[in-house]
Amino acid sequence: MDSRTTRYLKSCFQKHYKTAEIGLPDHLPNREWAFIFYDDMPEKMMHRHKSFGSPGEALDYLYGMAPAHVYNSTAYYEYPDARKMNEKNWLGAELIFDLDADHLPNAPRNYADMLELVKKETLKLMDFLLDDFGFSEQDIELVFSGGRGYHFHITSPKVLTLGSSERREIVNYLSGRDIDFKYFFREVSMDGDFGTGSKSFKGIKNLPVKCTLVGYDSGWGKRVALYLTDYMKAECGKKYKKDMFPELRRHEKVGDTTIKKLINITNSENGLKDILERGRLDFGVRNFKEIAAYFMQESMENFLNRFGASVDEPVTADIKRLIRVPGSLHGGSGMLVKKLALCELEKFNPLNDAVVFGERPVKITVSKPFSVQLKGKDLRIEEGIQEVPEYAAVYLICRGVAEYGYRRNQPDAV
């Protein structure tokens, strides 16, 4: 990036910071701040150990310096501006989850598709936070990173003093990688009527036993119930009976009688509903506990891809992490680091809603062809001298494929 381009970007960012609504963290004087400046480019030198005593001081600094990247600590410190970490005196830290396309298997290369995939993972994580962990919406701050993902900040006092090992355990739970499916399928002694109707399970010896799905109404148990019933519906939707339940047929205790009973359960009026809403598995299928656990174990990869949440473990485990500040700009894209209400996520489109610059025409010199979707437009930019809207110019320059203004010995705009 040449000096003229640097000056242009700084002026654009300064214009933003003049009126931007910056999401300053609570306990502002206890937060460390860090910055990367365009003047240091192409080196990404981080300037850290900075603190601010008041909102006005922080906002004046952002406007005056117009940094490329802005971070604050997720931790609270007694002395946030101390030069050595062991001198800061750690007081606690928010629980952070980072979802980024870099950490998703088989993430698409197309930026729009990549962001859509990350959004799906983010919605899954939101379900864990609200349902499994029971956090209130007031405890959760959701932020689009301005790049390729989202950040969750959990600010509940219950999590502030968690250490790295406890935070890693949370990541393990989210991933589901330590699940033992035998836990969910239990044979319990029963007292009461057989079949439908109310029952009380007392664990009394020598009573009849039945198979039930533990935790069917919440958490991983709910996900197991949904996966199992969806599988049964999909298999019974096949045209030929011989093609149904191929995974189960590989089990030595599954024969035609078992397959027939599974088909009857699926096609009955309340069979699948009883699994989802009551955890009922007492359908007269011999060895159902063993068969169900076998199927889930064989389907582990697909099950976890569908329901597990892929978060960046080092970020969550780090109790002294720096993270992007809501309302700032991402220096690698020029897009807004945007705070969202949880209800806004599903309809949020970063390629429109996080683009802050306008339509003013700007001349740039493009070093290689580049395609991107911004503001509802498919932009295909050819190499050479081009005139594009300012929002596209900022994005292309931040991505490193363009310089501001004309360059000699370049082809004219097409």
Swiss-Prot record:
Is-annotated flag, keyword Transmembrane helix? no
Q: What EC class does the entry list?
A: transferase
Alphabetical GO CC annotations of the entry are: DNA-directed RNA polymerase complex; primosome complex
**Could you say which cofactors this protein requires?**
Mg(2+); Mn(2+)
Alphabetical GO biological process terms: DNA replication, synthesis of primer
Alphabetized GO MF terms: DNA-directed RNA polymerase activity; metal ion binding
Q: Report the active site residues.
A: D98, D100, D312
Signal sequence range: none
Q: Give the keywords, sorted.
A: DNA replication, DNA-directed RNA polymerase, Magnesium, Manganese, Metal-binding, Nucleotidyltransferase, Primosome, Transcription, Transferase
Give the EC number.
2.7.7.-
Summary of subunit composition and partner proteins: Heterodimer of a small subunit (PriS) and a large subunit (PriL).
Role according to the record: Catalytic subunit of DNA primase, an RNA polymerase that catalyzes the synthesis of short RNA molecules used as primers for DNA polymerase during DNA replication. The small subunit contains the primase catalytic core and has DNA synthesis activity on its own. Binding to the large subunit stabilizes and modulates the activity, increasing the rate of DNA synthesis while decreasing the length of the DNA fragments, and conferring RNA synthesis capability. The DNA polymerase activity may enable DNA primase to also catalyze primer extension after primer synthesis. May also play a role in DNA repair.
User: Hey, which family's this protein in?
Assistant: Belongs to the eukaryotic-type primase small subunit family.
* PANTHER family per record: DNA PRIMASE SMALL SUBUNIT
**HAMAP family membership:** DNA_primase_sml_arc (MF_00700)
Full protein name: DNA primase small subunit PriS
Q: Which organism is it from?
A: Methanosarcina mazei (strain ATCC BAA-159 / DSM 3647 / Goe1 / Go1 / JCM 11833 / OCM 88)
What is this protein's gene name?
A: priS
